[in-house]
Amino acid sequence: MSLRFVIGRAGSGKSTLCLREVQEELKQRPRGKTILYLVPEQMTFQTQQALIGSEDVRGSIRAQVFSFSRLAWKVLQEVGGASRLHIDEAGVHMLLRKIVESRKDGLSVFQKAAEQNGFFEHLGSMIAEFKRYNVTPSNVYEMWQQLDAHSSSAEQKLLANKVYDLQLLYDDFERALIGKYLDSEDYLQLLVEKLPQSEYVNGAEIYIDGFHSFSPQELEIVRQLMICGARVTITLTIDEKTLAQPVNELDLFYETTLTYEKIKQVAREEKIEIEKTIPLMEQPRFHSPALAHLEAHYEARPNEKFNGEASVTISTAANLRAEVEGVAREIRKLVADEKYRYRDIAVLLRNGESYYDVMRTLFTDYNIPHFIDEKRPMSHHPLVECIRSALEIISGNWRYDAVFRCVKTELLYPLDVRKEAMREEMDEFENYCLAYGVQGKRWTAEDPWMYRRYRSLDDTNGMITDSEREMEEKINRLRDVVRTPVIRMQKRLKRAGTVMQMCEAVYLFLEELDVPKKLEELRIRAEESGDFLFATDHEQVWEEVMSLLDTFVEMLGEEKMSLSMFTDVMSTGLEALQFANIPPSLDQVLIANIDHSRLSDVRATFIIGVNEGVIPVAPMDEGMLSDEEREVLGAAGIELAPTTRQTLLEEQFVMYQMVTRASEKLYISCPLADEEGKTLLASSFIKKIKRMFPNVKDSFISNDVNDLSRSEQISYVATPEVTLSYVMQHLLTWKRYGFEGNLDFWWDVYNFYVTSDEWKQKSSRVLSSLFYRNRAKKLSTAVSRDLYGDIIKGSVSRMELFNRCAYAHFAQHGLSLRERDIFKLDAPDIGELFHAALKKIADKLLRENRTWADLSIKECEHLSVLVIEEIAPLLQRQILLSSNRHFYLKQKLQQIIFRTSIILREHAKSSGFVPVDLEVPFGMGGTGSLPPMEFSLPNGVKMEVVGRIDRVDKAEDENGTFLRIIDYKSSSKALDLTEVYYGLALQMLTYLDVVTSNAQTWMKKGHAASPAGVLYFHIHNPIVEMKGDATEAEIEKEILKKFKMKGLVLGDADVVRLMDNKLSTGSSDIISAGLKKDGSFSARSSIASEQEFNVLQKYVHHTFENIGKDITEGVIDIAPYKMGNKAACTFCNFKSVCQFDESLEDNQFRSLKDMKDSEAMEKIREEVGGE
C-alpha cells in the first residue's frame, strides 16, 4: 500500500505520464492485476480513447477507466448492495415534492417557497450536498438545536427556521429511501462501505487523474482505495515551488495544495507509505512559445510581457450572433487552410443558456460537426408537454391554454390523419373555442356545441345556414378528438385508489393515443431530414417517461394521493427529465462549459462570451443557503460546499485551466451586445491578457460586411446556407447607396446562386427581395368590379377608412379579412350595448308618449337595470353572464346607463330640442329607412352611402324647423374640421345632410328643416373632484359639465338657446358654445353659419365622389396617413398583411398638416367653390 503524487503545472504531462505507465504495463503484462484509472465523469470518454489509442494497446480487460459513480456500480455488482432501486434526479424531485406537500403545514420557511420555480432542484442539490460532505439528518438536527438556543436577531431566527425545515425534509427523504432505494450520493457512500470487500479493487494499481479537489465523501473513497490498492497515484496541478511555501488563499494553486495536504493527512492516518512526489517541470503540451509564456507567467505580478509573435487572438463582436459566426468562420479556416481536425478544436464558455441554441443553428449552417457537452431538458418535447398539459386540463378544470397546449403537441391527432389538414382544422377549432369562451364543464357536457356567426344585437334570426351547420358538425367532431382520450384518463384518475392506478391511467392514455407509433414516425422523419440528434430524442423520451412512471410506482405505488398532488409530483418529475448526451463522434468540435470541462489534446481553444460578470464570475447567492449562513454553519463544524467568496478565490485557477488547454492557438472573444441589443462590457480578464501580449491587436467581428475591406469580406463567403444572407446584405446596400471599389466577387457569388441547379430554386425567394418593392399594384377595372360589384354600398366609416389608408380598405372590404374573434368584451361591444340600452329606453318613452324630462331619478335607475338585463343575454354570446368578473362589469355598465339617463333627463329639461328618432337607418331598406346618399360615378358605377344615425333631435320656432344630430360615444370626441378636410371625419356631417335633405318626406308635418348642428354625447360615469364641503346640487352641476356635448352648432343665438334654455350669457353647461353680454358668441364657441354648413355638406359629397372614383379604379396604395401623433397604423389590424416599413423607399406616411378650424374651413371653401 503506497501513495504517489505526480504534480506539475498545466501542460506538464501528468496525464501523459500516467497513461504511458499504464500502456507500458499492459504491453508487458496484459493479464496482470487490475489497473483502475479514475477520472471525473466528463473525462471518461476521452481518457478511454487515449488509453487504447497507442499502437501497442488496442484494447484491455486489465485496465479500466472509471468515474467514482461507475466504480461504485462495478463494486456493488461484485460484492452486492446494488439490489436496491436506483432513484434518479427526476425520482428525487418527485419524492421531495410529495414529502414537502405532506409536510407543508409544519414548515416554517419553505411553505411558500415550495411554489417557486426551481425549488425542488435547489432542495435536491442541498440534500446531495449534505451527503457529499457527510452531513447526516442528525447532524442537521443538532445544528438546529444549537441555533435555536442562541437565536436573538431576526437573521439568526431565519437561519434556525431554515435549518429546522431542512432537517425535517432531509430526515423524511432518508426514511423514504432506507432499505428500498439509492440515489447517486448513496452509491458513493455504499462504495466507501463495500470497497474493503472487493476482490476487483484489492491489490489494484490505481490512478486518480484530473481532479483538483475532493468532497469529504470522495476523500473517504480515496482513503479506502489507498487501503485496498497496491499503489495509488494521484495527479494534481501544482507548481512544486508552491509546496515549499506557506499556504496562502490568494495563491493560484491554493485549492490543489489543500487537496494535496488533505490526502497526505489521510495517508498518515492510515499508515500508508508516501512515495517521493514526482514533479514535472517541462511544458511538453505547448507548441506555441506564446502559450507556454501564458502558462508559465499567468499568476505573475506585475504581468510578464511577451513581445514575440503571439498565437493569441482577442476579438470583440457587434453582438453574440456575430461572435459565434466569427468563431465558425475561423474554425473552417483552420480546418481548410491549416489542416486541423475538428476534434483538435474546443469552444469554452460559461453562459451556455445564451449561446447553445445560436451555436447549434450556426455551426450546422457552417457544416461544422460539433458536440455540446451539456444535457438538454426534455420539458419541451411533445410527449412531456402532452402529459403535463393533459393532467393540467383535468386538475385545472379544462382551461383554454392547457387544452390547446395539449392539442398542439399533435399527439391527440388520430394516427392515420394527414397532419397538415388536421392542423388547419384545429386552427379553426381553436378560433371557435376562443370566440365562444369554451372552457370548464362545456368540454365534458354531452350537449352538442352550437355554431352561429355573431353579427349584432339586432340579429335575432334563429335560422341556421348550411355553412353554419357544416361548421357545427366539424366542431363537434374535433371536440371529440380532443376530449375523448382526456376524459377517459380523467375518469380513470378519479376511480384510482392508489398512485399505481393513477400511473396506469397515464400509461393507458399514451397507449390509446398510439404514442409509441407516433414517436417512431417522428424519429423516421427526423432521420430522413438528416437530424439525427432529434431522431434519438424521440427514442430517449419514451424510455425516460416509462422509467419515470416505474419509479413513481416503485416509490409511492400503494399510497393514496389527491389528483392535484399527483399532477404536481408528476410535473416535478417531468421537469427534471434530461436527454442523455450522445458520445461525440471521432471528429467533432467540442463545445463545453468552462467550470465542468476537462479537456486534453486540443490544438486550438476558443473562449467566448468573456464579458464582465461572466468571466470572472460575478458573486451571487444561489441555492437554499446564503454565503453568510454557510459561514455560520461552517464555524459550528458543518463543512459544506464553498461559499461565493471561496468560489471567487478559486476563479483564478479556473481561468488558468481555461487558457492552458490548447497547445497551439488561443482565441478570446466577447460580444458588445446580447441577442436583445442590451450593452455588454468586456471582461477585465481580457485586459490582463492584453497586458501580457502587448503586440496582440483587438479585432472587431462585424455583422455588417459593408464595414469590411475586400479581403475581410471574402472570408464571409462560406457555405451556401450562410453566404446567402451576406450576399443579400451587401447587394441590398449597393442597391440603396451604391459603393466604390472592386467588389465584383459578390456578383460572382450572386451568379452562383442563380445558376446552380441545387441553389437556384432554394435561393430564388430570398434573392428576389433585392428587387422587392412593397407597393400595392393598382387593381384592374375588372378585378375591382368583381370585388366591389356594380353598386358600391358602404358606410361612412368605410369611406373614412379609405382616406386613412386605401390598402386597409382593400384588406377589409375587398379581401374581407378580419381579426380572430375572441370571447372578450371590446370597446365596440360596449358601444353597441350603450346604443341599444338608450334606444330601448327612448322607444319605451315614445310608446308612452313621454320624454326624458318626465323621468324621475328612481325611474332612470329602474329602466337602466331593466334594459341591461334584457340586452345582456344577447350581447357577444352571453359574455356578461359568463363569469363573476363579467357580472361585475355588467353592474358597472348599468351604472353608466343610469348616470347617462340622469344627464339626458337634465338635458331634456333645459332644451327645446326633442328626440325625433333613434338608430335611424338610411339606405338600409325596410320600413322607416331613409334613402341612401347616392352617387353616379364617372365610370358608370353607382355608389350608395348607407348607415344608421344614433339620434335625431328637432326643435321649432318662428324661423322654422331645426334638426341636429347626436352621436353617442364611449370616449370623448370633438369635431375637427381638419379631419373633415382630409376625409377622416365625415360621419356627423353626412348624417346631418341625410336628415335635412329628406326632412320634407320624413318629418310628419312635411316641412323643410335647417341644420342646427352635430354633437357628440360622451357616455360615461365621471368622477369629479370638489373643494371643501360641496352640496349634492353642486356635485350634480359639476357632473353635468362633464357631459358637455362637443361638436359644431349653428351660429344662431336663438337656436343655441333652444339647445340650452338656461343660457343667457356665459358658457353653456350642455353644449360647447357661449354668449357674450352683447348677444354675440364667445371665442371658444364651436359654431358655423348656415352657409358654412351648406359648404361642408357640399364638400362631403365631393369627398365621397372622389373616394368612390378611387375605389372603382382599383386604388389600393399602402399609404397610411399621419397627422401629428395620430396615424392610420396605430390601431390597424392589417399591419402584418401590408408589411408597411418606413425603412423602405416605397413605404412612407402621407403626412397631413394639422390646421386651425378657420384655416381648414377656408380650404374646404376653395375645394367646392363656396363663398
UniProtKB/Swiss-Prot annotation:
This protein's UniProt keywords: 4Fe-4S, ATP-binding, DNA damage, DNA repair, DNA-binding, Exonuclease, Helicase, Hydrolase, Iron, Iron-sulfur, Metal-binding, Nuclease, Nucleotide-binding
Organism domain of life: Bacteria
PROSITE patterns membership: UVRD_HELICASE_ATP_BIND, UVRD_HELICASE_CTER
A Gene Ontology molecular function term of the record: metal ion binding
Domain UvrD-like helicase ATP-binding: 1-390
Ligand binding (ATP): 8-15
SUPFAM superfamilies assigned to the protein according to its UniProt record, in alphabetical order: P-loop containing nucleoside triphosphate hydrolases
All copies of domain UvrD-like helicase C-terminal, residue ranges: 281-587
GO biological process assignments: DNA recombination; double-strand break repair via homologous recombination
Free-text comment on the cofactor: Binds 1 [4Fe-4S] cluster.
EC number: 3.1.-.-
Binding locations of [4Fe-4S] cluster: 805, 1129, 1132, 1138
Quaternary state and interactors: Heterodimer of AddA and AddB.
NCBIfam families recorded: addB_Gpos (TIGR02773)
Note: Despite having conserved helicase domains, this subunit does not have helicase activity.
Listed name of the protein: ATP-dependent helicase/deoxyribonuclease subunit B
Record lineage: Bacteria, Bacillati, Bacillota, Bacilli, Bacillales
Gene name tied to this protein: addB
